Structures are given as C-alpha cells and as structure tokens.
A protein has these predicted regions:
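Carbohydrate transferase catalytic cores enriched for Leloir-type hexosyltransferases
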Residues: 1-177
C-alpha cells in the first residue's frame, strides 16, 4: 500500500479504504493514510467511499469477516461497473487445517467462495498459490458467467522502504478487546 501511495500508476488515484463487520459499506482510510505518509491532518475524514464505473477495488488485506459481511456491498460496486480484485496469500487453512485454530478452514473457505463469486479476478502471491486457487475453483468455485481471472506476482520485502511497527498504538486496549 505504501508503495502504491508513494508511486501511483499514472492512470490511477490511490485511495485506501476499509470496512468492518459492524458497519455497512467501505470507507476511505484517510486518517490511516495520513499517518502512514506522515502528513498533517487536513480535515479529510473517513467518509463512505464514492465510486463510479471504471474504478478498481483491490483488496490487499485478508479480513475474513469484513469481506464476507460486506459481500452485498461488493456486489453493488460490481454492478455499478467497479472492477474488483483481491490478493490471495495462500490456501493453507483449507489445505492443512489441522495446523490452524479450529474453524479457520471454514472461515477461509467462506472468504474464498465470496471473493471468487464477486471478483473479476484474484492476484496470488506466487505461481504455487495461483495453481492452488485454480485447483480449488474446479470443485469449490461458484458458477460464473465469465471465468475468474487468476494472476500472480513474486512477493518480496523492501526493508529499506518498509514501515516497521513501533509498539502498540494508543488505542490498543480498545482494538484488542
């Protein structure tokens, strides 16, 4: 996200967004973005997103509950002409459920079914994950008018330009409860 914000493609304006299970729809993550970019507050709030045909929604974070709870809203976006993509990091909770907390496999399966139903495509962090998604879709994927696009990229780390954590935020006790 930081790289996209600092180096946006010429064709696009990058607007980080977020959703929770407690509210309907996605909101701009402007407070988060200002903090991430170390920018002064300029009065922009985390308002509900505005969208139009041709926009692209890229789900970078794995947030099972928020995505599955917002599936109807994502359908509204798609029906309005917004192209939707999600990053898939792995299928390990489904492939080897015994090494994850009980129920994680069902949660991951529900999330994957949701994104494969509403998305134009998924972008996987490796060719291996893309192959796993392709195989999973053969038996678990929803019926679609158009096939789900499956791409992949090499994930890596740029330690010099990363944003390291610096302890717990001031509102940690509220977040962790």
């Amino acid at each position: 996200l930081l790289n996209l914000l600092r180096n946006p493609p010429a064709c696009c304006r990058i607007e980080p967004v977020f959703a929770t299970s407690r509210t309907h729809g996605y909101r701009y993550a402007r407070k988060f973005a200002r903090k991430l970019l170390d920018c002064p507050s300029v009065g922009l709030e985390d308002d509900p997103i505005e969208f139009q045909t041709g926009d692209i929604f890229l789900g970078l974070n794995l947030n099972h509950h928020a995505v599955t709870d917002q599936i109807r809203y994502l359908e509204v976006l798609r029906n309005a002409g917004v192209r939707i993509f999600f990053v898939v990091y792995d299928l390990l909770p489904i492939l080897i459920p015994k090494v994850f907390p009980p129920g994680t496999d069902d949660l991951h399966d529900k999330w994957l079914k949701s994104i494969s139903r509403v998305s134009d495509g998924v972008v996987c962090i490796s060719r291996s994950v893309a192959d796993d998604v392709t195989e999973w879709l053969k038996t678990n994927g929803p019926k679609r008018l158009r096939p789900l696009k499956i791409g992949w990229f090499h994930i890596g780390a740029d330690i010099e330009n990363s944003v390291p954590t610096q302890g717990l935020p001031d509102d940690a006790s509220q977040v962790l409860n």
